[in-house]
C-alpha cells in the first residue's frame, strides 16, 4: 500500500450536513464483503433517477461535468453519521476519493476512513465555508493537501489541520493493521521460537 505524503486533486463541494452512511451507500448494496465495486453505488439515491442506476440525476453535484474525476470531497458537519457500515468508506475510496474535508465526522466513520487509507480532515466551520465559497467561484479547481506539514492549500490560502501522530505515521508509510504487525515480524518469530512446546 502506497503512502500518502501529499495529494493534489479536484474537489467536489457536497453542500449538505449530516450525510449518513445510508445516503453514502444504501443498504441494498451491502451484500458483498470485498472492498471493490461499491463506487458505482456511491450516493445512489441522490446520484441516479432510477433504481437501476442507469439514469444520472443532472442536479446532483457528483454528476456535474466540472467535477468528474474529483478525488477530494468537501462537505458540511457530521459526515458519515448513522450506522457503522464500513462499506461507506469503501464506496468513497472505490469511487476515487482520497481526502475528505468537513467540520466534523461521525467517530466510527472517521476511524473506518483512516483504516481504509483515506484522509478525513477536520477544519472549523468558518474555514470550511471559506473553501466552499472558493470552490464555487473557481469551478474545477484543485486543492493541495500536505500530510507531512498538515496543511490544506486553496489558491494562496493555507489551512492547518490536526491528526493523531499514529494515524499520520500509518498514512505516510502506507501501513494498515497487517503492515503494522509485519513491522515486528522478527520479534514475533523470536517469541514463537521460545514458546514452550506444550503451549504450541
From Swiss-Prot:
The protein's name in its UniProt record: 3-isopropylmalate dehydratase small subunit
Enzymatic reactions: (2R,3S)-3-isopropylmalate = (2S)-2-isopropylmalate
Family to which the UniProt record says this protein belongs: Belongs to the LeuD family. LeuD type 1 subfamily.
Pathway in which the depicted protein is active: Amino-acid biosynthesis; L-leucine biosynthesis; L-leucine from 3-methyl-2-oxobutanoate: step 2/4
Keywords: Amino-acid biosynthesis, Branched-chain amino acid biosynthesis, Leucine biosynthesis, Lyase
Top-level EC class as recorded in UniProt: lyase
Keyword Kinase applies: no
Role noted for this protein: Catalyzes the isomerization between 2-isopropylmalate and 3-isopropylmalate, via the formation of 2-isopropylmaleate.
GO biological process, one term: L-leucine biosynthetic process
EC numbers for this chain: 4.2.1.33
Amino acid at each position: 500500500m502506497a503512502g500518502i505524503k501529499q495529494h493534489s486533486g479536484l474537489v467536489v463541494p457536497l453542500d449538505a450536513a449530516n450525510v449518513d452512511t445510508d445516503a453514502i451507500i444504501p443498504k441494498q448494496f451491502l451484500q458483498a464483503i470485498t472492498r471493490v465495486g461499491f463506487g458505482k453505488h456511491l450516493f445512489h439515491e441522490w446520484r441516479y433517477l432510477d433504481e437501476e442506476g442507469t439514469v444520472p440525476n443532472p442536479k446532483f453535484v457528483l454528476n456535474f461535468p466540472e467535477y468528474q474525476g474529483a478525488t477530494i470531497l468537501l462537505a458540511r458537519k457530521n459526515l458519515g453519521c448513522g450506522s457503522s457500515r464500513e462499506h461507506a468508506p469503501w464506496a468513497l475510496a472505490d469511487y476515487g476519493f482520497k481526502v475528505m474535508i468537513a467540520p466534523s465526522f461521525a467517530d466510527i466513520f472517521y476511524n473506518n476512513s483512516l483504516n481504509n487509507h483515506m484522509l478525513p480532515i477536520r477544519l472549523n466551520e468558518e474555514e470550511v465555508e471559506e473553501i466552499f465559497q472558493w470552490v464555487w467561484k473557481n469551478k474545477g479547481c484543485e486543492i493541495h493537501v500536505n500530510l507531512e506539514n498538515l496543511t490544506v492549500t486553496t489558491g494562496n490560502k493555507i489551512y492547518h489541520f490536526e491528526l493523531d501522530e499514529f494515524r499520520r505515521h500509518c498514512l505516510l508509510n502506507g501501513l494498515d493493521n497487517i503492515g503494522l504487525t509485519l513491522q515486528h515480524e522478527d520479534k514475533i518469530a523470536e517469541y514463537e521460537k521460545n514458546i514452550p512446546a506444550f503451549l504450541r
